[in-house]
């Protein structure tokens, strides 16, 4: 088979979908996974991690016009057998069978988190993509339920295939980057783009309470600000009495991120809506316990290997952070549950099952 892949998310800085595609493509380079298929990667500019397939760079900006007009013409010219669209939308008018991945549908569940134009674009394209594709892939039972209830898609059409997890544990002997000067102490880490649904102001407020009691506590925020309506993260940090111990890394290259994971004693991710929530699982794979909001998808993804707090309770969040950083007994309990949780997330299994889905969609 000639399998086409929309590879736009592999260009530029890595994204969540880009890392997801990198994990699948890495497995598909292995002879036992490839099954003799040819992979054709399509993008509007050069892509990273393309070893498993030939890259077709097509002119354009990579926006909706590119996806709906330029890409279908190239698919027809290359006589591909199936198209995998890993990022929420797909060409709506093509004879090529399609499989689309909808990792979450926050833009439909909580439209107030998006500008009206962007939210409308996402809702229309994702709903139509799910309707015209042979199969829909998602990463959790929670997301499957959301797609069924909000888009009216037949449950039998939706496949749940959890991704693998890439451990951020650094290589033995790897030194910290010279520009990253980490102070001694107990470091709490957040990694992920900053959205309103992830409640960074609550995290800063709760950490401020903890840091007032513990002079060795540090908070590191890693991620760019994508809030809508806009939240001024810098102002929130500067208003904290412990602002000097709150460090915001708007972007961290891989070596810096590995160093932050190496120093972290706890991970916090106060998100009220995710398709799965990969960064807490990555932290767990590095031996770092996580604190999450108590949501259905958080329970599904991390089970007994995380501690949970209710939305909006700053005091409860502060108490849980304190346990995460300073209560060795609580940390051991969470660590004991980690292997069973992590066993559900394996790239070889995800790649095999995704390839089987593409084969069946032909």
Show where each model-derived region lies:
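Carbohydrate transferase catalytic cores enriched for Leloir-type hexosyltransferases
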Residues: 1-362
């Amino acid at each position: 088979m000639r399998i086409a892949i929309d590879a736009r998310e592999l260009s530029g800085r890595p994204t969540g979908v880009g890392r997801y595609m990198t994990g699948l493509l890495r497995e598909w380079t292995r002879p036992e996974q490839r099954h003799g298929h040819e992979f054709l990667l399509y993008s509007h500019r050069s892509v990273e991690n393309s070893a498993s397939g030939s890259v077709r760079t097509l002119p354009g900006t990579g926006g909706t016009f590119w996806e709906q007009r330029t890409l279908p013409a190239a698919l027809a010219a290359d006589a591909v057998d199936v198209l995998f669209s890993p990022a929420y939308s797909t060409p709506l008018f093509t004879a090529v069978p399609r499989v689309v991945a909808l990792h979450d549908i926050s833009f439909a569940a909580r439209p107030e988190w998006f500008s009206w134009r962007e939210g409308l674009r996402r809702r229309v394209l994702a709903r139509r993509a799910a309707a015209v594709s042979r199969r829909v892939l998602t990463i959790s039972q929670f997301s499957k339920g959301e797609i069924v209830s909000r888009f009216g898609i037949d449950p039998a059409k939706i496949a749940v295939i959890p991704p693998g997890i890439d451990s951020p544990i650094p290589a033995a002997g790897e030194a910290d980057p010279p520009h990253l000067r980490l102070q001694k102490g107990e470091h709490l880490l957040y990694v992920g783009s900053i959205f309103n649904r992830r409640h960074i102001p609550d995290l800063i407020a709760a950490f401020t309470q903890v840091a007032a009691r513990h002079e060795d506590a540090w908070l590191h925020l890693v991620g760019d600000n994508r809030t809508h309506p806009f939240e001024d993260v810098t102002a929130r940090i500067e208003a904290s009495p412990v602002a000097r111990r709150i460090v915001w890394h708007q972007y961290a290259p891989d070596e810096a991120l590995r160093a932050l994971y190496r120093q972290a004693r706890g991970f916090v991710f106060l998100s009220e809506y995710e398709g799965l929530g990969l960064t807490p699982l990555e932290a767990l794979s590095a031996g770092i316990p996580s604190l999450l909001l108590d949501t259905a998808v958080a329970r599904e993804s991390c089970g007994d290997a995380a501690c949970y707090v209710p939305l909006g309770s700053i005091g409860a969040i502060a108490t849980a952070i304190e346990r995460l950083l300073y209560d060795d007994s609580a940390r051991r309990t969470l660590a004991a549950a980690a292997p069973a949780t992590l066993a559900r997330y394996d790239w070889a299994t995800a790649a095999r099952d995704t390839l089987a889905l593409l084969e069946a969609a032909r």
